[in-house]
């Protein structure tokens, strides 16, 4: 069942709501929507609204706190067994067709401070991070009962995209200056983007694209979270909370 932003916010902040929400967490795996379409599925079936799950329609403000620019993504090699591509960061990615749905990087652009400084401009703030008409689109969505959402890159996930899991985990100990500079850059850009937006319209929900899970537990310990990740999260979260964003911070698995 579709619920509006007021109902969602009432529920998520422990207000009055007649029943628990029933949601599907992640949706179809990569590649399934295309397969289902070929089999005749409707768009409502593909986005799962046809099956009785609760959902709130979200509007992500058209502003970009992520990497902006970079290389043109190209296919380097396509064989029956795998696909090799080059992404916007310059990484070589390999997708094994028989056993994977997400390509894995074979190399990474950041190994030390000099290599980070070469791509750092892709993460710094500029007015070009705002799509024309972003405010009008957000106001229209709000008037239709949509949840107004902001996103920030993950405090672990984005550095791991730049460095890889192993190199990042070593760098926390061997090159903390590098990690602090990456986090400060991400934090400054996210803060300035959502500072400008929240002066014009209230954000309902701040989400973070995070992934620090390993097979046996977190890939990062509490000491590293306290030093590197927590200050980054709080920089934007405290801003939005002071501007009226309710106590909602995380991912929105039920939103479409």
Predicted regions and their residues:
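A structural signal for short, hydrophobic beta-strand segments that form beta-sheets
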Residues: 72-77
